[in-house]
């Protein structure tokens, strides 16, 4: 089956049933060490994960690690340009769950990003990025502890699909000519819009299927959270991109109010029900005024639409959601993308799960990570219906490779996500406890040490940080 790999002689496969993992007590899990500092952070990660499993389960559960190759290491073993050997793809497909360090993409043509390629090959349509603050972590924000969110990012569509043509190419010229001549409408206000002939062109596909399966996972996750955190916010720029990001919002609401009707309430529905609860004699029109402050400035036609919305909500869900019942449901709302970047800083405790498209999610997850201490402590997971890959969210930092000084927190916390995905919560909790205690005790690597006040004079090595985490399992 494999050209150059030898799977572990013991262990069992993780399988998937209806999109959920079925995990044996001795799973075989492929790992990719990663390029650059992967040589340092993977051994530290393996040490911590193994120690947590041993401590939590006393030998009843055990991971059998299976080394596979991608990036620079793959080229060394399989030959030049073999950055994604078939062996590796076969192993991940066979064993279902994998973890990896950072990967770089060789300069030149071909695959633009190894990470994006993996997501597309295995249809890992959900990127999950938790942003949680560990007390003591240096942060530029005054109150980073208030931010505790999870970004759900659609992973397979949007401009990351890579359908684009460079300026001046035959494809760009043909597409621009076709759009200008055949598809771009003339409007009374602006006349005939035109794409400049010296433009590069990219396609931004957003599908109902892709949008709703992402929002479905976000809602299912929200249902598992404490009641105060059961909220999903649809993040979009639908006010400008009316046929891509606008429908993402609409399809998200559609899913929430059909498939999850008994378990979800939209923000506007909560206002309508809440208004009636406060004043049982409230008229439909008065309620409409309250949910739309600009009601009086609207045309009669638009006012009628809002009144119809109020009436429809009260007729359809009052029995199941009224009289305060909506407070026990998962709240689904939406926010404009540029606004949410501001609000995770100014009103961070108002949000829980942010569900969004690929590009927005890329920006948003990194911005949120900065609030709680940076990408060095930012885990990530890419999850589909038949596979899941957990990964470092930072780059390869080749200048630090082999120096045993880089922060392994991102991959270690990605390992925590993997353990939680597998249902091994006790081991995951031990690692989170160990990381929290190490940071609180100022036992940290240089990137955190140099920002702490007062400054830590002797930061730990990468390997020492891993050992410090393990030492706090018994605290």
UniProtKB/Swiss-Prot annotation:
Transmembrane segments: none annotated. It comes from Synechocystis sp. (strain ATCC 27184 / PCC 6803 / Kazusa). It is an enzyme of class 1 (oxidoreductase). One of its GO terms (molecular function) is magnesium ion binding. Binds 1 Mg(2+) or Mn(2+) ion per subunit. Can use Mn(2+) or Mg(2+), but the activity is twofold higher in vitro with Mn(2+). GO terms for cellular component: cytoplasm. Keywords: Cytoplasm, Glyoxylate bypass, Magnesium, Manganese, Metal-binding, NADP, Oxidoreductase, Tricarboxylic acid cycle. NADP(+) binds at residues 104, 394-400, 407, 446, 450. Homodimer. The record marks 160, 237 as: Critical for catalysis. Its EC number is 1.1.1.42. Mg(2+) binds at residue 362. This is Isocitrate dehydrogenase [NADP]. Catalyzes the oxidative decarboxylation of isocitrate to 2-oxoglutarate and carbon dioxide with the concomitant reduction of NADP(+). Is specific for NADP(+), cannot use NAD(+). Induction: Induced by nitrogen starvation. Expression is regulated by the transcription factor NtcA, a positive regulator of genes subjected to nitrogen control in cyanobacteria. Inhibited non-competitively by ADP and 2-oxoglutarate, with respect to isocitrate and in a competitive manner by NADPH. It is found in: Cytoplasm. It catalyses: D-threo-isocitrate + NADP(+) = 2-oxoglutarate + CO2 + NADPH. Optimum pH is 9.0. Active over a relatively broad pH range (7.5-10.0). Belongs to the isocitrate and isopropylmalate dehydrogenases family. Disruption phenotype: Essential, it cannot be deleted.
């Amino acid at each position: 089956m494999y050209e150059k790999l030898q799977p572990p002689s013991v262990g069992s496969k993780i399988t998937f049933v209806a999109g959920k993992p079925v995990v044996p007590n001795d799973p075989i899990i492929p790992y990719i060490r990663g390029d650059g500092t992967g040589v340092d952070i993977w051994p530290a990660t393996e040490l911590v994960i193994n120690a947590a499993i041993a401590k939590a389960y006393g030998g009843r559960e055990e991971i059998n690690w299976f080394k596979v190759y991608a990036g620079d290491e793959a080229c060394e073993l399989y030959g030049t340009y073999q950055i994604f050997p078939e062996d590796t793809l076969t192993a991940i497909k066979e064993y279902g769950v994998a973890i990896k360090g950072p990967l770089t993409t060789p300069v030149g043509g071909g695959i633009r990003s190894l990470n994006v390629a993996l997501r597309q090959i295995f249809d890992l349509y959900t990127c999950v990025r938790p942003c949680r603050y560990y007390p003591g972590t240096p942060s530029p924000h005054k109150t980073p502890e208030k931010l505790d969110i999870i970004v759900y990012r659609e992973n397979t569509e949007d401009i990351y699909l890579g359908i684009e043509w460079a300026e001046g190419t035959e494809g760009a010229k043909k597409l621009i000519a076709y759009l200008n001549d055949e598809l771009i409408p003339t409007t009374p206000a602006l006349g005939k819009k035109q794409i400049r002939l010296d433009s590069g062109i990219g396609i931004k596909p957003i599908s109902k299927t892709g949008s709703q399966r992402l929002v479905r996972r976000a809602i299912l996750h929200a249902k598992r959270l404490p009641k105060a955190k059961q909220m999903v916010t649809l993040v979009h720029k639908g006010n400008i991109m009316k046929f891509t990001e606008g429908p993402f919002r609409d399809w998200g609401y559609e899913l929430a109010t059909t498939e999850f009707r008994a378990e979800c309430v939209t923000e506007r529905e909560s206002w309508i029900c809440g208004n009636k609860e406060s004043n049982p004699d409230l008229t439909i029109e008065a309620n409409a005024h309250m949910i739309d402050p600009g009601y009086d400035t609207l045309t009669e036609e638009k006012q009628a639409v809002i009144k119809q919305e109020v009436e429809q909500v009260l007729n359809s869900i009052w029995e199941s959601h009224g009289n305060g019942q909506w407070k026990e449901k998962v709240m689904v709302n939406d926010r404009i993308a540029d606004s949410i970047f501001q609000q995770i800083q100014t009103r961070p405790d108002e949000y829980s799960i942010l569900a969004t498209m690929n590009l927005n999610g890329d920006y948003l997850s990194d911005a949120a990570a900065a609030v709680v201490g940076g990408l060095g402590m930012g885990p990530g997971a890419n999850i589909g219906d038949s596979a899941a890959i957990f990964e470092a969210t930072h780059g390869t930092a080749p200048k630090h490779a082999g120096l045993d000084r880089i922060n392994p927190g991102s991959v270690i916390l990605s390992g925590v996500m993997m353990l939680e995905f597998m249902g091994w919560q006790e081991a995951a909790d031990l690692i989170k406890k160990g990381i929290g205690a190490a940071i609180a005790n100022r036992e940290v690597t240089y990137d955190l040490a140099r920002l702490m006040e007062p400054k830590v004079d002797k930061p730990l090595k990468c390997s020492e940080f891993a050992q410090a985490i393990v030492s706090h399992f018994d605290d």
